[in-house]
Amino acid sequence: TDVRSLVEVNLLSVMALVDGALPALRKRGGGQLAIVSSLAAYYGLPATPTYCATKAGLKAYGTSLRGWLRSEHIRVSVILPGYVSSPMCAAMPGPKPFLWQPERAARRIRRGLALDRARISFPFPLNLGIWGLSLLPACLAMPIARMFGYDR
């Protein structure tokens, strides 16, 4: 099914790749892992529930790995981009506020990795808005999401 394939591609394949990379990272005495999630990890958008669920799973996985692997000198950063111009983004339903070009996103990610940030999220206004929605009770968050066009 589409649900199963999305979970396999977005979540399970990343977990398998990390699992496969860990022996080499341990052997060399450390390294860095960058796990790409999404700002959609913070608040489940009605139009893309499976996508949001997989990205929330990656966020939790990466955050857990960071603490687990720290003593082995393996750094882990979770990348939480908003909308980045791409064919995949263009095909997604709903508005795409604060759309970034890939080059700008790459610069932000590179800087965050160099600083060993736990989370690299952008753009700030969308990050703040989505994070804020996640703190509200559903009876308030859902009408706000609908107001911005995220109702399907």
Report each predicted region and the residues it spans.
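Active-site helix of classical SDR
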Residues: 18, 54
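Short, flexible catalytic-loop segment of classical short-chain dehydrogenase/reductase
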Residues: 81-91, 95
